[in-house]
Amino acid sequence: MLSLLTRPFLPIFCFLYGPQSEGSTRIQCLRRFVTFLLGLVLGFLLWKLAALNFTLGRLFVNGATDLYVFIIFVLVTGTIFMLSLPVRAVILLIFVALVGKSGRTYLRAVAFAFIISGPIANLVENAGEVARVFVCTTVLTYNLSKTRFDLMAKPFTNTLKHMRGDVEEIRHTFYELQEVLVDLKYAVENSDIEDEKYGDKNTKPIYERWGRETSRMNVSEIGNGGKELPTPAAVQERFQRNMRNRCKHQLRSGHRACLEVFRNGYRKCTTNFPSMIAKAICWPYRVDIICELDLFGNPDKICDPSAVVPQNFGETYVELLKAEKKLFDNSSQIVVNYEIKDEQFAKSQLKSAERTGQAFKEDFERQKRIFNKVMGILQKILCLFMLRMVYVSINYYVKYLNDVEFDNFYITKYFKHVDQRRKEQRIDAILPLRTYEKSKYIDVDHIFSRTHHESTTVCFNLLQFLLELVTAGLFILIDHLVVELLQIVRKRSKIVYQQDGEHEVRFNISGVGQMARLLRTTMHNFNIHEKVSTSLSNKECLPNAHVLPKKMYYQLILLYLIIIVLIYQSTTFLRMRRVICSFFYYKREKQRILFLYNRILRNRLRSLEFLIHDAEDNLATHRIQQQVNVFLWLRFSCPVAFGWIRHFKFAKRTCMICRGLEDSTFTVCGNCGLPYCDDCAEDLNSVCFQCGVVLTRGAEGSESSVEVYTYRKEK
């Protein structure tokens, strides 16, 4: 198949690298130029491979710098590829390593990077959306509760807001009441003024000022706790004395007024008449003795207040002072304030929903940044697997040149050429290979064939990769479930909060008195009339699920399919490494082929020993197979019912030597039951290696059967 693929390019290769090109300078220059162009192409591919994984564009802020680095890298790669033979081999081996174990590891790292940037990153995005929904719902709930609380608490808040104005009005009302009490206090306690001074024009301002000072004094005294109250008897006696003095003062005031009237009349009369006649006519005005007469009786008897003032006036007045003290105590310095108990707890409870949500969001963003940094570092570490491909390629190149046994099990055209030449010379040849040798060597004409070791490795790698598929599938499934859950929540959780109504509170206080006025002043702030008509929705709080594009899933599936193909056919692709090295070092390849040919010849001289050794290694596997394989157990336990399953691969026995599947030519030992294929039985000279019994195939065994039996006994 390889020759079929390379056949179209064979004329070009012969033209450039044929024997006739060795002496042509023109062809050699053309060969150099073609090699340089191929180096440029490979350099471009290497750059893309490196830039894809290490994101080198991020290292260069300026786009022109990135372009210069790219050009320099490609030119240097093309030049070295043209000049250095080892570099050519290593660069080509790097691209072959992409399809080998290192390449698979690299592609697995890329696939895991897809998982990180796809489902895992999407889980983080959706987690952020859940955080946003939580914050939004918290704010919405807070606002709804706050609206309802404000509506309920508005009378109290209005009262607190207008309390200062109400306090001033109440204080003014208290002052008006105190002004009424000042006159009464003056009449009871401070009316004992001298008779000749009471009522003069000069004393009237003193009286008014005394009233104001008394008012301030009473307020101050009340504010300071007040003075000691008088006894009822003292009040009774003082008020009666004041009433008596006031009565006498009124009588004296009448006497003075009478004298003033006579005096003024006489003056006017003498003014209007001549002096000779005035005395005769105006003499009646000189008779002011009338003013001296006690027309109403004895003043002490008339001004006696005992019959007028009640006997319990003192007690009533003292009770009035007590009531005033209780009513106006600290009324002049009213201060409305409140105190929060357990202030720290109150502050924590009064924290708004916006601050809580912002703190939650900041904490989530901080954790998200840490997660992204960790995932970024992990992704860069995975990208370092590309360096492993370079290391593996160089290692293969070194071992190919230094270790003649390394990767040397191919039956090539030159191998067949040597074997045919030996046949023509009638010397022992190798081809065709024996049955037990076919599983150890690969014929390059059958490019898809594998050795037994390669088949085992492929199965193990497929099982290992299956675990990675399960892990990736779990991440994808979890992401899909989260997205579906968020979409269901968005579809079925939309709520519209509609509030329509009227909230009215009215306090009606009847009465015209001072207390009714005070109550109306205090309680009018509790009156409220609010019409509520609000419509709120949680639409903004519904989650917006972040869905991965289908393109990502297609790319991931395609990548996994490529990895599976590479695992299954990795051995086929890796054989290109030998082809590349043999192309550049064909003499070394001839040495390796001749070494392989001679090694097979040497092994055939000891073939019997190798056959028995392989059979002993396979014996344990055969016994386990007999116990574990249910189909084999059914086939041999119930041959009548399940004999038909012998036609299927899973119910067939394998040869003890070459592990080939059972066919019609198989020979089974009659003593121990070990199976052998026809070729391996012939190589063993028809003698069972386990028990030494001759294998019956319709013909007698050769003389070498005794040799096999003796070898078994010695072992």
UniProtKB/Swiss-Prot annotation:
Residues 54-66, 131-373, 479-553 are extracellular. GO terms for molecular function: ubiquitin protein ligase activity; zinc ion binding. It is a multi-pass membrane protein. Keywords: Cytoplasm, Cytoplasmic vesicle, Fertilization, Membrane, Metal-binding, Transmembrane, Transmembrane helix, Zinc, Zinc-finger. One of its GO terms (biological process) is sperm plasma membrane disassembly. It is found in: Cytoplasmic vesicle, Secretory vesicle, Acrosome membrane; Cytoplasm; Cytoplasmic vesicle membrane. The keyword Metal-binding applies. The chain crosses the membrane at residues 33-53, 67-87, 110-130, 374-394, 458-478, 554-574. It comes from the Eukaryota. A zinc finger (RING-type) spans 655-691. One of its GO terms (cellular component) is acrosomal vesicle. Its main location: membrane. Component of the sperm acrosome membrane. Required for breakdown of the sperm plasma membrane after sperm entry into the egg, which is an essential prerequisite for successful fertilization. This is Protein sneaky. It comes from Drosophila melanogaster.
